[in-house]
Amino acid sequence: MDLGIEVILKLFSKNGLENLFQVASFKFIEFGENSQRIISLQQDYIKTIDSVIAFLQGKNPTLARQICSGNFLPEASRFDQLDDSSENLNWAFGSMGMQDKAKHLATLYLEDLSDFIVECVDENFGFSRYAERLGRSANSFDEMYAHLQSDLTYIDKITLQILEEKLKSINPKLVCISVPFPGNLYSAFRCAQFIKKHFPEIKVSMGGGFPNTELRDLKDKRVFEFFDFITLDDGELPVELLNSNVQIPNSNEFKRTFLIENNEVVYKNNTIRHDYKQAEVGTPDYFDLLLDKYISVIEIANPMHSLWSDGRWNKLTMAHGCYWGKCTFCDISLDYIKVYEPIAARILIDRMEELIAKTGENGFHFVDEAAPPALMREVALEILKRNLTVTWWTNIRFEKNFTADLCILLKASGCIAVSGGLEVASDRLLELIKKGVTVEQVAKVTRNFTESGIMVHAYLMYGYPTQTVQETVDSMEMVRQMFEIGILQSGFWHQFAMTAHSPVGMFPKEFGVVPEMNEITFANNDIQFKDKTGINHDKFSFGLKKSLFNYMHGICFDYDLQDWFDFKIPKTKVSPDFIENSLLEDNSFVVKSSAKIVWIGGKPIVEYFTKSKKGSSWEMAKLTFHDKRQMFDISLEKDKALWLVEILEKNAVQNDKKMTFGQIKEDFEQRFEDFELFWFSKSIEILKENGLLSL
């Protein structure tokens, strides 16, 4: 079950809001002006909430017109950002439409209610996180433990009521709680605490991203007042063995599991069994989740950002771990990064088909650390071969293997977006990070994706160890140019954070930083540090993020970089046409002999005619092609045209075996002369522009 969505749906309902406003009215505190307004409009919120939630669930699409027409949703402070002009909102959503505009307004409406809950009912509330501060690198368990001894909050009571109903209906012997982020930790402990108090016979285990990264040095025995087990890394075998231990108490075989033994915290990894291979783990099962009740929200008017919160995506991975595994800011010492294991494309597409059949949804988010280009190519080919209609996106490295032709193939298979790390946008720092890319290379790759119709989101970083103010300004200019040219559509600046399991965290002296070390008895991931440069990188946050927000909306490119800051910054040293010049190189005549040649178009209509010149005549053939958007034709000598038709058929995307460029060249030269003259002729170039790909 997903307690998160079930709590949200119970809270944001007619009955939920009636109870909420009643509870708030008993609070003897002085409400702020915004909360007073929301209380005054409580009947409007109660009246509209069920309709708005149904709309965000995709069940009430006609409500979009009423929401967009105005005077339907009660408006509090979150709507102040719209006061400039209704034209601004219409312009911002010009590329996204009325449904998305209505989702954005409905999201502001929910955020107003969230602000009210935080001020008047429960200060820890958040839509996707709760009491996040308590879980953020809490080296000691003291604060969390003290919080868990306090009275239940309003949200706690709703959560535990739903949990109790579920436990009574299922009567489980083992409850496994997944904790992906710090914002899920407090609620996980509250649930475990409730189970231990009211259902002491049930065993409780924690797993997921948070313990995998943060709890590897766990020593505090008090944690096991709530949980019987905490497992690390891949969960299939550890959970299977926990189940065996619950069913057969004397089993005593564990995989990467913390537990209490003789009143001490012990880590057990005593099984001789190996983890399941990725090909063996099976397809995710969403059977018990309320798939039709999730809400789709849009926080800001940006098409890429909406992917994270608008709609529900089936989650899969192309490969376990990262095929690069060198970035110095990344947790490359942990198994979820360092153990690289790709999955065969055929198995992946089998899983996609199974999920489509089970969920009725054909949208997929591949949640790889960095999806491998070669595997993405094979996945795309398999999707096209099976004639599937799917929509998918993933995380990548901006590496040179993402050629223009590969991007066209990915788009044809249903890829709509990619996200990747440009990080510091400085070649010196990218080398220090061991990113394996340059700014120029990133520009070329993002151009290839953009021109194929795939949206690009860039993760951006500032404050990396040894980064100078000049480098921060120059990276900002690089980003400005990339947005102005149009090869980036979305981005996000985040400040560098030093983690315990990254090379920077493990070898801080090599990177010129001094860590502030504490005794670790509970969580250990984010490490506070001092950079020997002495630069206060915090002050750049607002200017970087504000400029980026405007660049994403296609405006303010002519502003001086100084305009975004209220303190003096140096002039950029980056040439104003650096990115533009990076894209000038033409590699269209460079094709590897081993490159697969793939035709993703259809069969041509062949017509013959005779051409005459200076008393000579010869037979020609016109090949007419129809694709989804247009018709085009090329004319060739008859024998070469027939050879080409044969080659296109052999290399059609539906076929298992494709000829390489070298094999095609050899085949051509057995019949004709001057292959290069033919292959790089105007007629074949037209085909290349319309689906003849070198991969």
Q: Whereabouts are the PLM-identified features?
A:
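Glycine-rich beta-alpha loop elements in corrinoid/cobalamin-binding modules
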Residues: M1-L82, L89, A106-Y109, E132-K277
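Flexible loop/turn segments at secondary-structure boundaries
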Residues: E6-K10, P182-Y186, N212-E214, V239, ...
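A structural motif corresponding to the C-terminal lobe/cap of the Radical SAM core domain
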Residues: L9-L17, I29-Q36, S40, D44, ...
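Radical SAM enzyme core and accessory elements
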Residues: G16, L20-S25, E33-G126, F529-L695
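Active-site cores of enzymes that catalyze phosphoryl transfer or operate on phosphate-rich substrates
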Residues: D112-I162, E299, P303-I332, Y336
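N-terminal [4Fe-4S]-dependent radical SAM core
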Residues: M144, E264-K315, Q630-D633, E689, ...
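Secondary-structure-rich domain cores
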Residues: Y154-F226, P342, R346-I349, E353-I356, ...
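Radical SAM [4Fe-4S] cluster-binding motif and immediate context
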Residues: P284-M455
